[in-house]
């Protein structure tokens, strides 16, 4: 079930972000993700509209929107491949006719996921936190 996040969800949201980041971004030193947790809270989550996917009381994933910027979409690693990410992205697309996000170039599964859902690569930028290249991806409803 999709629902808007509540303040009491925040610790579990950060846990999902950390676990999924460590798995999906293994090309980045793990200490980077551990150190970035507070920045995640203050830079994105405190300023974003967040939806969570919940099943039987457990949060399986979340997505965060800041205007038309998809700041985060993360699913617990042990729950990936079951439609959770698809449902979260559908929610974002239902709220914004146009979406922008950034995806690490090395994160090929995520690049494929977004391209399958209609996103196009618009350019590359260097991530200030890690120094790794990210694709700027864009979605426009037709």
Predicted regions and their residues:
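Conserved beta-hairpin
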Residues: 48-61
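Conserved acetyl-CoA-binding loop of GNAT-fold acetyltransferases
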Residues: 115-124
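Short glycine/proline-centered loop/turn elements that form peptide/ligand docking sites
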Residues: 85, 89, 106-110, 127-133
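A short beta-loop-alpha structural element at the N-terminal edge
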Residues: 1-15
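Conserved GNAT-fold acetyl-CoA-binding loop/helix
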Residues: 14-41
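A short, internal acetyl-CoA/4′-phosphopantetheine-binding micro-motif in the GNAT/acyltransferase core
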Residues: 69-80, 103-104
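Conserved acetyl-CoA-binding loop-helix of GNAT-fold acetyltransferases
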Residues: 81-94, 112-116
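Conserved GNAT acetyl-CoA-binding A-motif
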Residues: 94-106
């Amino acid at each position: 079930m999709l629902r808007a996040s509540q303040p009491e969800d925040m610790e579990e949201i950060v846990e999902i972000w950390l676990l999924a980041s460590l798995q999906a971004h293994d090309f980045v030193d793990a200490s980077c993700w551990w150190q970035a947790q507070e920045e995640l809270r203050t830079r994105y989550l405190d300023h974003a509209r967040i939806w969570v996917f919940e099943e039987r009381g457990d949060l399986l994933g979340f997505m965060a929107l800041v205007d038309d910027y998809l700041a985060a979409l993360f699913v617990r690693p042990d729950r990936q491949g079951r439609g959770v990410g698809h449902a979260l992205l559908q929610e974002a697309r239902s709220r914004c006719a146009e979406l922008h996000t950034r995806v690490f170039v090395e994160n090929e599964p995520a690049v494929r996921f977004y391209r399958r859902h209609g996103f196009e690569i618009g350019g590359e930028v260097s991530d200030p936190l890690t120094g790794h290249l990210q694709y700027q991806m864009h979605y426009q409803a037709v």
